[in-house]
Regions:
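Positively charged, aromatic-enriched patches within helix-turn-helix-type DNA-binding elements
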Residues: 140-205, 210-212, 217-218
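Structural detector for helix-capping/boundary residues
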Residues: 43, 106, 130-132, 137, ...
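N-terminal/domain-start alpha-helical segments
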Residues: 1-122
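Flexible, glycine-rich phosphate/dinucleotide-binding loops
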Residues: 84, 215, 223
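Short, Lys/Arg-enriched segments at the junction into DNA-binding effector domains
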Residues: 2, 110-168, 219-228
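Short amphipathic alpha-helical/adjacent loop interface patches that line ligand
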Residues: 24, 109-112, 136, 178, ...
Length: 228
């Protein structure tokens, strides 16, 4: 599960990243707020942990902007402000939970789990292929219980192939699915993404039918998924 952390305190950030990764999360850490706006336009996260006291933009302003732009991911606010009014402002701006520094990392973990679990009031739907799990809502992938970090195009390609497992898809079909009619796409883009998927998951996952296209076999036709 992928988390975005926006925190400018290096010592605190280091500790949070270590604790969250130890708990199985994939963590992207930014020390300023404005880059988060760009990242969230192109990347998918299960939750955002946001410090209010950032060097380039106030966290409340950042949160309001995210909500105005339609971002619905769960947000956990971190701040040194302990006044009731500050907590109310944060919640009214669109945060889902609030923690006051200093805090125990165990509590952060517990709150984050609860936040993701109750996000949108339901468990996230999954697509399963053997030991591979895809979470379409957050575009996250796990393999044998471990998170696998994919680019948006890699995720989309994997989803397309698994959704149609047992069917050969031509390079042109896959390129159309990924890029539409964008003539600026590299001619070997599909091959590059497939190469990366094989490295990040396992080499036998995607088969090349020479002169025809690519296929992920149906599970009853597939070889046993190898252990890492």
């Amino acid at each position: 599960m992928r988390i975005l952390l926006v925190e400018d305190d290096v010592m605190l950030g280091d500790g949070m990243v270590d604790a969250l990764r130890h708990s199985g999360y994939t963590v992207d850490w930014l020390q300023q707020g404005l880059p988060a706006l760009s990242v969230l336009k192109s990347e998918e996260f299960a939750a955002l942990i946001l410090d209010l006291n950032l060097p380039d933009i106030d966290g409340i302003s950042l949160l309001r902007k995210l909500r105005r732009e339609g971002h619905q991911l769960p947000v956990l606010i971190l701040t040194a402000r302990d006044a009731l009014d500050d907590r109310v402002v944060g919640l009214d701006a669109g945060s889902d939970d609030y923690m006051v520094k200093p805090f125990a990392l165990q509590e952060l973990n517990a709150r984050l789990r609860a936040l993701v679990r109750r996000s949108k009031g339901q468990a996230q739907a999954t697509l399963e292929y053997g030991d591979i799990l895809l979470y379409p809502e957050s575009q996250q992938v796990t393999y044998q219980g471990e998170p696998v970090r994919l680019t948006p195009h890699e995720y989309k390609l994997l989803l397309e192939l698994i959704s149609q497992s047992g069917r050969v898809l031509s390079k042109e079909q896959l390129q159309q699915s990924l890029y539409g009619w964008d003539e600026g796409a590299e001619s070997n883009a599909v091959e590059v993404h497939i190469h990366h998927l094989r490295k990040k998951l396992y080499s036998e996952l995607i088969r090349n039918i020479r002169g025809v296209g690519y296929i992920i076999p149906q599970l009853d036709q597939a070889t046993r998924i190898p252990a890492r």
